[in-house]
Curated annotation (Swiss-Prot):
<feature type="disulfide bond">
    <location>
        <begin position="614"/>
        <end position="691"/>
    </location>
</feature>
<comment type="function">
    <text>During the asexual blood stage, recruits host complement factor H CFH to the surface of merozoites resulting in the down-regulation of the host complement alternative pathway and thus, protecting merozoites from complement-mediated lysis.</text>
</comment>
<dbReference type="GO" id="GO:0005886">
    <property type="term" value="C:plasma membrane"/>
</dbReference>
<feature type="glycosylation site" description="N-linked (GlcNAc...) asparagine">
    <location>
        <position position="168"/>
    </location>
</feature>
<keyword id="KW-0325">Glycoprotein</keyword>
<dbReference type="GO" id="GO:0009986">
    <property type="term" value="C:cell surface"/>
</dbReference>
<feature type="signal peptide">
    <location>
        <begin position="1"/>
        <end position="26"/>
    </location>
</feature>
<keyword id="KW-0472">Membrane</keyword>
<protein>
    <recommendedName>
        <fullName>Merozoite surface protein P92</fullName>
    </recommendedName>
</protein>
<dbReference type="InterPro" id="IPR038160">
    <property type="entry name" value="6_CYS_dom_sf"/>
</dbReference>
<feature type="glycosylation site" description="N-linked (GlcNAc...) asparagine">
    <location>
        <position position="71"/>
    </location>
</feature>
<dbReference type="GO" id="GO:0098552">
    <property type="term" value="C:side of membrane"/>
</dbReference>
<feature type="glycosylation site" description="N-linked (GlcNAc...) asparagine">
    <location>
        <position position="765"/>
    </location>
</feature>
<feature type="glycosylation site" description="N-linked (GlcNAc...) asparagine">
    <location>
        <position position="511"/>
    </location>
</feature>
<dbReference type="InterPro" id="IPR010884">
    <property type="entry name" value="6_CYS_dom"/>
</dbReference>
<feature type="glycosylation site" description="N-linked (GlcNAc...) asparagine">
    <location>
        <position position="633"/>
    </location>
</feature>
<keyword id="KW-0336">GPI-anchor</keyword>
Length: 796
């Protein structure tokens, strides 16, 4: 009897313990402040790396003799390991400018005796010899650094990484005339950029501007904030008023001018924000309320900030949030009497995605919810997710997020179907984010959405796509990196602007007529239109030579535009039947008298982009490529089924701007996984597209295989039908998967595919496609407890 009672007692204790774990699973908690043993006998700041590196947290202190003292801690309190970075033969004080941290290395940029140096710390755990870098364009003898500490930054997409070094050039507007003070934008700083980790630096200086009212900012600190640059200014002045701090977010870039403004996150008017960061799926902030500093955070990452407060108050300056190991964030700050403190914050990671709550409970499992969105007939309830906050798949090829839905709520067929053309019927749109069910329980299902990171090269920033649920709620994904964008109707100080490759240009007009709005653009410029009074142009990725043109803007004045030569050609395997893109080797001029063209795609690296340009206005004119393609007997099939998998992605058809006529481009992208599968299958994919050129139907055959070379493919083609075994061998035989109506495009079904195996191992959100893994700790923990329980039971 005693044994039975003991078993029951152990069981109840375990249940109670597990329930407690469940209730505190996503609660943000903290430890009381502790003084660290890190000290600095100079007046300069201690600069911390923004995240741990190889299990350690690093602090950087500038000293005499051109020395940077690098301290390391594991627990945030005891700084026991110290290394020096030093330039010999110099007695001046070293000043830290930038610290970049990735999975593989730390990059330190510092200044001494008006020279800039760069040094790197990698897997050998030693600093490289400091190397002088030429950033003389940004040097100012009387200016102070705008210190950056963070990840490698992303511009326009996930692939374009850069580092920067900046000087504080915020001007003193106190003794200037009113007209100068009322200027719309004010200079914050000047930065130099490198896209190869400091080996080469761009000649152009990137200016930071703000449209917020201030007269001077004494100290600028920069950090990454979900793909953008966050500016933290302290000891700011606005005429005769002193402002303790100012927080700005930079997102618009043009002509190497980066424009910063107040973030969309808002606090109450009686609260001032001293610091703000985004770490480990939380917004974290230090706020000042009635002369008291408090720690605040939010569970919901949507645009509104409804903060929760941690029950701690403190005084100090130079606050640094640092992402530490074991799901912790350390807050370091400088207190009174030159003492340094740390507050440890437990931030349990959540799933990136949306939680459809049926009551007013706080979302602690997912990063977004529908709770704060006002629901009315004009605006459906929406959960908005920025692409820069999404996590990567374990192979680094996809962006992922999850949505938890009650079992009676379904994903509809028009989920995440998108088009660059506002006038196109949605049945011709392209499914750009695909779904699969990863967890199916009695009361709810979890649906995972995924799309390739390559999309961020094509789905331009601040463009969004949405999914409608069966209850009319919406999930919105915004592609939101720092972008190269200019609005020609924005009030400029000049009537002349420069435009560069890949820039997005908005132009509004009073009368939407084709004749009055014909302009000369570089070859390969795309055009979109979301409103009847406005057009947007995405300048070609490659401008062969410079030229000029003029635009009539809304004020009916002339804007002179100079297109600057430069950029990079992309290589698309396919053909341009309009000769309107710089990215194709084959064009209309390459055609012989034959109306059939064979494209052999057999030379592969790790990926491949396949393209087709046809002189039509839209899919209405019969352009079936690449969402649906033709196979033999003019049979129309879905591209996913042709490749035998659901990880094939098509870029929505885009309209290429032409002064005469029109052209549409469709792109099919094959990533590493797709290529590997084709190699393993030893198969050849064949399909064709048709295009009407000057009343002649041209048939373009695509033969795709990374396993066979072009000669082998031709040999297979020349065989008799019954002998051909390698071509399209993965096409399903089910009739419902093959469409015979070649007069219209049938939309792809987007009903979530149920995945039988467990969820794939995924990485946490980061701007680098590499970080710690989620291993399903709860399941492992329960398994361990179960084993212990069974062991005790056996013992008894």
């Amino acid at each position: 009897m005693f044994a039975v009672n003991l078993k029951i007692c152990i069981f109840l204790s375990l249940v109670s313990f597990l329930l407690q774990c469940k209730n505190t699973l996503a609660n943000v908690t903290f430890e009381q402040k502790v003084q660290t043993n890190l000290s600095h006998d100079k007046n300069g700041d201690i600069v911390y790396g923004h995240r741990e590196f190889k299990g350690g947290i690093y602090a950087f202190l500038g000293y005499d003799n051109c020395t940077i003292e690098v301290n390391k801690t594991v627990n945030g309190i005891d700084w026991n390991e110290k290394k020096d970075v030093k330039v010999s033969g110099n007695n001046n004080i070293a000043v830290v400018y930038s610290i970049f941290t990735s999975e593989e290395k730390m990059i330190l940029i510092f200044k001494c005796d008006n020279k800039f140096y760069i040094t790197k710390y990698g897997k050998e755990f030693k600093w490289s010899d400091p190397k002088v870098i030429d950033v003389s364009n940004v040097i100012g003898t009387n200016t102070t650094p705008a210190v950056y500490s963070g990840s490698l930054l992303s511009m326009n997409n996930d692939f374009e990484k850069y580092i920067l070094v900046c000087e504080n050039h915020s001007q003193n507007y106190i003794n200037v005339v009113d007209q100068e003070y009322m200027r719309e934008i004010r200079l914050l700083g000047k930065c130099m950029l490198s896209f190869d980790e400091g080996n080469n630096w761009k000649n152009e200086v990137m200016n930071l501007y703000s449209d917020e009212g201030y007269t001077k900012i004494n100290t600028l600190r920069l950090s990454d904030y979900g793909g953008k640059i966050l500016v933290k200014g302290t000891n700011a002045q606005n005429l005769n008023q002193t402002i303790r701090s100012i927080i700005l977010l930079c997102s618009n870039l043009h002509d190497w001018k980066l424009f910063c403004g107040l973030p969309t996150i808002r606090f109450r008017k009686d609260i001032s924000v001293e610091n703000l960061t985004y770490l480990n799926t939380y917004h974290l902030a230090i706020v000042k309320n009635e002369d008291k500093l408090q720690l605040a955070f939010t569970y919901d990452l949507f645009e509104t900030f409804d903060p929760q407060y941690l029950n701690t108050e403190f005084n100090g300056v130079s606050h640094y949030f640092v992402l530490a190991p074991d799901e912790m964030v350390y807050l370091f700050y400088h207190g009174n009497e030159k003492k340094n403190y740390v507050i440890k914050i437990k931030t349990v990671p959540r799933k990136i995605g949306c939680e459809l709550n049926t009551n007013d409970t706080v979302n602690k499992i997912y990063t977004y919810t529908y709770k704060y969105i006002y629901n009315n007939k004009l605006s459906a309830k929406t959960c908005k997710v920025p692409s820069s906050h999404l996590k990567y798949s374990s192979d680094g090829l996809y962006k992922l997020f999850e949505v938890r839905l009650p079992k009676d709520i379904k994903v509809t067929e028009n989920c995440f179907r998108y088009s660059f053309l506002s006038d196109l019927n949605n049945k011709y749109h392209t499914t750009i984010i695909k779904t699969r069910v990863i967890n199916k329980l009695e009361d709810y299902v979890e649906v995972q959405f995924h799309f390739p990171i390559y999309y961020t090269k094509f789905l331009y920033n601040y463009k969004s796509t949405y999914c409608v649920l069966s209850n009319n709620y919406r999930i919105v994904v915004e592609f939101d990196y720092i972008r190269n964008h200019i609005d020609l109707d924005f009030p400029f100080d000049t009537d002349t602007v420069k435009l560069y490759s890949n820039e997005s240009v908005t132009h509004a007009f009073r009368n939407n007529t084709e004749k009055t709005h014909v302009h000369k653009f570089p070859k390969g410029t795309y055009m979109t239109s979301y409103f009847s009074y406005e057009k947007e142009y995405v300048i070609s990725n490659y401008i062969e030579e410079p030229f000029s043109t003029t635009f009539t803007i809304l004020t009916q004045t002339q804007m002179n535009v100079h297109f600057m030569a430069g950029g990079q050609k992309y290589k698309y395997e396919g053909i341009d039947l309009t000769d309107s893109s710089p990215n194709y080797e084959l064009s209309l001029n390459s055609l012989s008298d034959s109306q059939n063209v064979d494209i052999f795609v057999s030379k592969f690296d790790n990926n491949k982009t396949i393209g087709f340009v046809c002189p039509v206005k839209s899919s209405y004119d019969g352009l079936n490529c690449f969402d649906n393609v033709y196979i033999k007997n003019k049979t129309l099939v879905k591209i996913e089924y042709l490749f035998g998998e659901n990880d094939i992605f098509v870029v929505p058809q885009r309209r290429i701007y032409k002064t005469e006529g029109t052209a549409m481009e469709s792109l099919l992208y094959l990533n590493n996984n797709n290529v590997k599968k084709l190699i393993d299958d030893k198969s050849i994919i064949h399909f064709y597209c048709e295009c009407n050129v000057n009343n002649n139907v041209i048939k373009v055959n695509y033969y795709i295989s990374p396993f066979y070379d072009e000669n082998s493919i031709k040999q297979e083609i020349n065989k008799k039908d019954q002998e051909i075994t390698m071509i399209n061998k993965t096409i399903p035989q089910d009739e419902k998967d093959i469409l015979f109506n070649n007069e219209k495009v049938v939309p792809l079904s987007n009903e979530p595919q149920e995945i039988i195996q467990p969820p794939i191992q995924e990485k946490l959100n980061t701007t680098d496609p590499s970080k710690a893994y989620i291993y399903g700790a709860n399941i492992i923990f329960i398994a361990i407890i179960s084993i212990i329980s069974l062991s005790i039971s056996s013992f008894i």
